[in-house]
Amino acid sequence: MNNNIINLIAAIILSLSIIFGWQYFVVKPEQKKQQQQIAVQKAENLKKQQLKALVEPATGIVVQEESQVQRIKIESESLTGSISLKGLRFDDLILKKYKQDLSKNSSEVRLFSPANTENAYFAEVGLVSNLSSVKLPNNDTIWNSDSEILSPEKPVHLFWVNEDGVKFLVTITVDENYLFTIEQTIVNNSDKELPVQSYGLINRKYIAVEKAVNILHQGPIGCIDENLKEYSYDDIKDKKSEKFAASKVDWIGITDKYWLSSLIPDKSSNYSSNFNYALKQGIERYQVDFISPVQIIKPGKNFSIKSRIFAGAKKVDLLDKYEKQYDIKLFDRAIDFGWFYIITKPVFYAMNFFYGYVGNFGVSILIVTVIIKLLMFTLANKSYRSMKKMKNLQPEIDRIKNLYSDDKARLNQEIMALYKKEKVNPVAGCLPILVQIPVFFSIYKVLYVTIEMRQAPFYGWIKDLSAPDPTTIFNLFGLLPFAPPSFLMIGAWPILMAITMFLQQKMSPEPADPMQAQVMKFMPLIFLFMFSSFPVGLLIYWSWNNILSIIQQYYINKFN
């Protein structure tokens, strides 16, 4: 095994340790809180009281039987569910295109659930006022609707009139995907000025996040003042609340690995926003919310404001589309592409492009790997020549080391002089490695976080490229009727990866150091166990990359 492969192994192990260790153990540094003026602070305190009252039913203090709640049915190509006419709450939403798992009878993914259910999760937008005498729609308000069904072809119009004759109108539309648009209009038919603030909130009962997903962000997220704000559930639990005073809020929400619920406020003003945690009656809840400045509506005047709610799958092209169409900054960053974002997203685009032609993401991975190999061929050729020269110079280097073993400065001078004389660059062999590491992690991220790869099949027994190989040699790949423990789930693709790695070693010159050569012989076996639990799509990439490297090495050996 040559020094290039040794460097690759060491670099990958080191990079894995740094990336996983950093994301798992290091708590993100607290962001500095902005100084708030006295008026803003008063508004924040008022908002906290108002929004607390708005979500109080979600804590279980007020519970209404679901059968008694009037609802508007949601029906589109992507969604089914309903909106509660009591309080105008989005609390019943199912993603029709996605199943919980690959089993035949698997149910569809449910995103939103009513406040009094086990997995309560809902969104709402509305109005509050800093005057208690102003009667506004609230959680107990029963709205009147002109339709019982909301669909992309048929918006819903709702209205409610208070005791002073002030009319509140709401128009809700939904597109073919996951975006709701809510336009609120207030018609002030009273003889008094009407101070109002628009708000939006998403409230969720906490569901434990598995440690295995600490390599990606889950929890409150948003784009505030054109900066991405990410806080884990633990971050917000420790802080209780993270506040952002009057800011430009492009969007805020709560994200899962594949699903996102987010509020997209009107761009007409700045908003105060919060990421909150609360524990009531033993129930942990998280909430993200925003509220606008006070808007004074004079008698006889109207006021309208538009907000949007995204609730659905984090499809890359869909988030890109909304980001461009509605100027929603950093909306695609709801997908955690990680540190190598500038590489990971183009890698996804390439895979998705070829998927459009071949209809299989596994085949798309193979094609992208070939392209990467072709782009790196010249670099790999130069690297191999450099390593061959280094191999030939090893006896002379050993002689110099013995000669100047007591004089390190002279030793380094003589070795560098030898490199210069023979026109050898000692780091040339590392260049392909530096390219392969970000590509490796980018493909891993694409497989792990994109909804497009979720339950995407390859061929044969591979039904989900984002999951580990489901077979294992320890039950003869399913022939024996028992399931080994997870650490013994050594499937066919991990074995193929180890075999191709071993063959690649055989194609390469052994290290000059006998001890190092012995250690390297065990690396395929170590990697076999180390990567057996990784997404099988990554093992397909690595196995195919090894095969291409063997072919490339054969070509270079023959013609050089």
From Swiss-Prot:
Organism the protein comes from: Rickettsia rickettsii (strain Iowa)
Main location per the UniProt record: membrane
Pfam families per record: 60KD_IMP, YidC_periplas
Membrane topology: Multi-pass membrane protein
Any single GO CC term annotated in Swiss-Prot or TrEMBL for this entry: plasma membrane
Oligomer status and interactors: Interacts with the Sec translocase complex via SecD. Specifically interacts with transmembrane segments of nascent integral membrane proteins during membrane integration.
Subcellular location(s) of the protein: Cell inner membrane
Superkingdom field: Bacteria
Protein's GO biological process: protein insertion into membrane; protein transport
Database matches in CDD domains: 5TM_YidC_Alb3, EcYidC-like_peri
Name of the protein described by the UniProt record: Membrane protein insertase YidC
Entry-linked Gene3D superfamilies: 2.70.98.90
Keyword flag Lipoprotein: no
Similarity-based family: Belongs to the OXA1/ALB3/YidC family. Type 1 subfamily.
Entry function: Required for the insertion and/or proper folding and/or complex formation of integral membrane proteins into the membrane. Involved in integration of membrane proteins that insert both dependently and independently of the Sec translocase complex, as well as at least some lipoproteins. Aids folding of multispanning membrane proteins.
Molecular functions per Gene Ontology: membrane insertase activity
Membrane-spanning ranges: 5-25, 334-354, 357-377, 431-451, 476-496, 522-542
Gene that produces this protein: yidC
NCBIfam families recorded: PRK01318.1-4 (NF002353), yidC_nterm (TIGR03593), yidC_oxa1_cterm (TIGR03592)
PANTHER family hit by this protein: CYTOCHROME C OXIDASE ASSEMBLY PROTEIN COX18, MITOCHONDRIAL, OXA1
Key words, A-Z: Cell inner membrane, Cell membrane, Chaperone, Membrane, Protein transport, Transmembrane, Transmembrane helix, Transport
